[in-house]
């Protein structure tokens, strides 16, 4: 697409060489999070001090963090490369409400059961990925629910008021870009003005509703949901689908991301139609049983497990309506209850490719669309904030699923670059502030641990890959020296500080050949991993320029040219990339040799 000479000319014109990194890790994931010398230990101690400080804040000083002490919460970090992290890195707080609650535990730990609300959606998509074939993902909903076909026809002439059901697929539902209504009345009534009664509706200037004659409500089964004498239709998937048929869309299909519980209920209905199993059976056979998630439930746990659960209710009525009420279709959207330790098993299984092949998982863990915020993308059903490292400008995507309903708020965050994840679980009767508080805890985790994880990964990479590699062929003067640039603000990645090939100084010769002999930073001498698989004993790294893109501003169009991904693999010799280096690693992850493939040689690491 763009030659290196073109890029160098552009960089010369701009005055400073700036190329953008690939998306992904800058070092192999860290394996030591729990030894006394690990930077992550220091990061966790810092986080602990921050959380303990938050618990001492007065509400008048900070109305959000000042109420943290009244929220029961648990925080845990886990790693696929250090099993000790799960037990080492946990923080728990018991609120006064929990300590005096009529039901449930008085002391939370890693096995305490919390509601996780919309984290449930991750389980639904996970299970769907195991059961839907590629054709199923692209079928219109009218294929699964033929009763929607008539409304789909009406939408051709009036898409503002009718949903285009024949344009929406399970893939659109999973990726939150289907345009279906957010919440399915009467199943979800949090935002329904009628819940406040007719007087409250009248105060807002809303007209009275006639359930039998209203053009919208009269088409819904069991539309008299507010009447306690009427059985709710929320326990039946078919009725639920029918109740959504004539509602207007939020957006056109595939036009704009919009959070919708309805979408995941419909995805659960698709899953049920294809497998013939209930969601309880599906989750158990696909996920709970294989992973040993013995304390995860699709509805409130049996009463003999309540001593292991957080149930911060004020009275029996609230217990019945908020904790025990579990309409069947909602099980694919937001009813799961789980523990810190069970969610560790769940998150680790995704990062480890335990239940899905690696290629399917990598495809899943990508943004599908963006929001209007530059730091926030959307996937299926990922919420993907983009963390920016304050010193280097490094961008790290945090694959997150939040949950907030009833008595509980939660966050599950996966970070593939480091092969780690963390969970925040919170319980409180203060629904107005609980989600904000859980989010503040998550902020603290990210800000304390991301720099520590990056530093630990860099330290291990220097130890495992740094040094000099030499030819073992007699008379061949070839060697590579790999170091780590520790200059403050230096872009992350190992550095080829010296490369002699057949007696020639390759780095100097490359700089002269590229027309930038006095600008070594413009040369590809920084190594970042592109294929990390110690199981095979081979790790691929590619050479990038020594500069990072986030440091300097670029033009909106001209900046497109300043990107390493546009030139990767461009310079070749004998059909092999000049910038590709394959390392041999032992069982401990330490490099024993390196093969710069284009140079047709293998260099052994000196002790």
Describe the role of every protein-language-model region:
Residues 55, 128, 145, 271, ...:
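Hydrophobic residues within well-ordered, non-membrane alpha-helices that form the packing/core
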Residues 6-8, 110-112, 266-267, 329-330:
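Short hydrophobic "helix-edge" motifs at membrane interfaces and signal-peptide entry regions
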Residues 42, 64-74, 99-173, 248-262, ...:
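Short active-site loop at a secondary-structure junction
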Residues 1-20:
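Fungal secretory targeting signals
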Residues 21-97, 111, 324-607:
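Catalytic loop of the DD-peptidase/beta-lactamase superfamily, centered on the K-T-G motif
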Residues 68-70, 80-82, 92-101, 153-411:
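Short, surface-exposed loop or secondary-structure junction motifs
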């Amino acid at each position: 697409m763009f030659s290196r000479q073109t890029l160098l000319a552009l960089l010369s014109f701009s005055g400073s060489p700036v190329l953008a990194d690939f998306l992904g890790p800058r070092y192999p994931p860290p394996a030591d999070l729990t030894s006394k010398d690990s930077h992550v230990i220091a990061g966790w101690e810092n986080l602990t001090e921050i959380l303990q400080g938050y618990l001492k804040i007065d509400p008048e000083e900070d109305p959000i963090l000042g109420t943290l002490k009244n929220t029961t919460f648990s925080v845990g970090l886990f790693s696929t490369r250090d099993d000790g992290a799960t037990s080492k890195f946990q923080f728990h707080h018991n609120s006064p409400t929990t300590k005096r609650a009529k039901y449930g535990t008085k002391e939370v730990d890693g096995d305490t059961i919390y509601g996780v609300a919309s984290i449930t959606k991750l389980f639904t998509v996970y299970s769907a990925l195991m059961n839907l074939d590629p054709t199923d993902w692209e079928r219109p909903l009218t294929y699964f629910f033929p009763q929607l076909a008539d409304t789909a026809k009406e939408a051709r002439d009036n898409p503002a008021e009718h949903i285009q059901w024949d344009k929406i697929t399970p893939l659109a539902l999973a990726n939150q870009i289907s345009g279906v209504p957010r919440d399915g009345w009467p199943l979800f009534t949090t935002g329904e003005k009628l819940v406040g009664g007719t007087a409250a509706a009248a105060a807002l200037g809303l007209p009275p509703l006639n359930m039998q004659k209203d053009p919208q409500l009269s088409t819904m089964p069991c539309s008299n949901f507010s009447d306690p004498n009427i059985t709710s239709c929320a326990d039946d998937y078919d009725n639920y689908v029918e109740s959504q048929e004539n509602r207007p869309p939020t957006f056109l299909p595939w036009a704009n991301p919009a959070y919708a519980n309805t979408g995941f209920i419909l995805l659960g209905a698709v899953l049920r139609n294809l497998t013939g199993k209930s969601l309880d059976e599906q989750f158990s056979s696909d996920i709970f049983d294989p992973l040993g998630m013995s304390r995860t439930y699709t509805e409130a746990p049996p009463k003999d497990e309540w001593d292991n659960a957080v149930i911060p209710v004020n009275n029996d009525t609230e217990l019945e309506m908020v904790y025990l009420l579990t309409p069947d279709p909602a099980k694919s959207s937001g009813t799961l209850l789980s523990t810190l330790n069970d969610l560790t098993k769940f998150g680790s299984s995704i990062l480890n490719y335990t239940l899905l092949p690696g290629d399917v998982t990598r495809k899943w863990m990508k943004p599908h669309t963006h929001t209007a915020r530059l730091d926030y993308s959307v996937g299926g059903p990922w919420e993907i904030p983009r963390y920016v490292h304050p010193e280097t400008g490094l961008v790290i995507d945090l694959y997150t699923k939040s949950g907030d309903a009833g008595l509980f708020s939660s966050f599950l965050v996966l970070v593939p670059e480091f092969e780690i994840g963390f969970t925040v679980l919170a319980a409180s009767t203060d629904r107005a502030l609980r989600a904000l508080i859980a989010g503040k805890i998550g902020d603290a985790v990210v800000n304390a641990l991301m720099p520590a994880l990056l530093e630990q990964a860099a330290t291990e990479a220097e130890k495992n890959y740094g040094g000099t590699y030499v030819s073992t062929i007699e008379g061949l003067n070839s060697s590579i020296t790999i170091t780590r640039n520790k200059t403050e603000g230096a872009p992350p990645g190992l550095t080829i500080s010296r490369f002699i090939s057949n007696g020639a100084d390759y780095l100097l010769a490359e700089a002269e050949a590229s027309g930038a002999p006095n600008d070594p930073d413009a040369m590809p001498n920084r190594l970042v991993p592109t294929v990390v698989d110690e199981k095979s004993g081979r790790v691929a790294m590619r050479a990038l320029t020594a500069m990072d893109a986030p440091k300097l501003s670029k033009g909106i169009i001209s900046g497109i040219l300043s990107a390493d991904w546009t030139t990767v693999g461009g310079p070749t010799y004998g059909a092999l990339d000049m910038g590709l280096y394959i390392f041999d690693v032992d069982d401990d992850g330490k490099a024993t040799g390196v093969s710069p493939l284009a140079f047709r040689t293998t260099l052994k690491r000196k002790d």
